Structure formats: structure tokens, C-alpha cells
Amino acid sequence: MPITDHGQPPTLSEGDKKAIRESWPQIYKNFEQNSLAVLLEFLKKFPKAQDSFPKFSAKKSHLEQDPAVKLQAEVIINAVNHTIGLMDKEAAMKKYLKDLSTKHSTEFQVNPDMFKELSAVFVSTMGGKAAYEKLFSIIATLLRSTYDA
């Protein structure tokens, strides 16, 4: 299932949640390294996305050394971690992601297509598990929700 960012977000089955709960701790225990790898890969694939991060001072070839890049990578993975923590509280998860959508659309003016692209990089980095494809489709769709309203 490719990452989607329009329409009704998919629903995580109990099996999906179990798969995420079993594998996420292995990913998150090295969150600094893993989050930086995801963000750097995303910026490599979508160099224009760097324009959305005005605090990044490093040249494109030295992003891995920029403290602002490392901090943003951690912010992103911690938001994913928080979302995973809300998997059993669907209303709270939706509210959290819609609030992030509002912030990204009004305060940061992020191109909404980037949520889907970043989600796809996350999933490919995590081995493309179907449960993560569903999770990140939920994330991408709800982060885009304010833009489509």
C-alpha cells in the first residue's frame, strides 16, 4: 500500500498496532541516529524542502553537522513517537495531528505534499512494513487536513 494523504485515513487493525508496538522500540531506541537518517534522506530526495526549514544554516552537503537539522529530526521522530503512543486513543491522535496540521499551515507555511514524501521516506527506512504504511498514511492525511479544509 503506498502512502496516501487524501480522503479517509486508513484504520490500524489490532495486528497493525501490535506490529508497530513490537518494532518501534528498536527504531526509537536510536532515535537521534534514525531520525537524522530519515531527515537527511528526505532532504536529499527533495532538496527544495530545505526551504521549509529557515533555521538550517549548513550548506546542503553538510546538513548532518548542523545542530538545527539534528534538532528538527528529533522533533519529527518525537512527534511520530507521540502519535504511536496515541494509537489506542483515536480521537486524541486525530486531534494531535490536526493541531500539528494547523501549526504547519499557519505558522510554518509548509508545502502539504511534503508530509506524504517524508512519510514515504520514514516507511522505506523502516523496511516498508504494511503497518507503518497505514500509520504514516494516517499521519500524512491528517497533517494535510487543514490545507484541504
Curated annotation (Swiss-Prot):
Key words of the record: Heme, Iron, Metal-binding, Oxygen transport, Transport
Keyword Heme: yes
GO MF, one example: oxygen carrier activity
Binding site for heme b: H104
Pfam families assigned: Globin (PF00042)
CDD domains named among the record's database cross-references: Mb-like
Globin domain: residues covered: 11-148
SUPFAM superfamilies: Globin-like (SSF46458)
UniProt cross-references to InterPro entries, sorted A to Z: Globin, Globin-like_sf, Globin/Proto, Globin_lamprey/hagfish, Mb-like_M
Additional free-text comment from the UniProt record: This globin is the main component in hagfish blood.
Family designation: Belongs to the globin family.
Name recorded for this polypeptide: Globin-3
Organism in which the protein naturally occurs: Myxine glutinosa
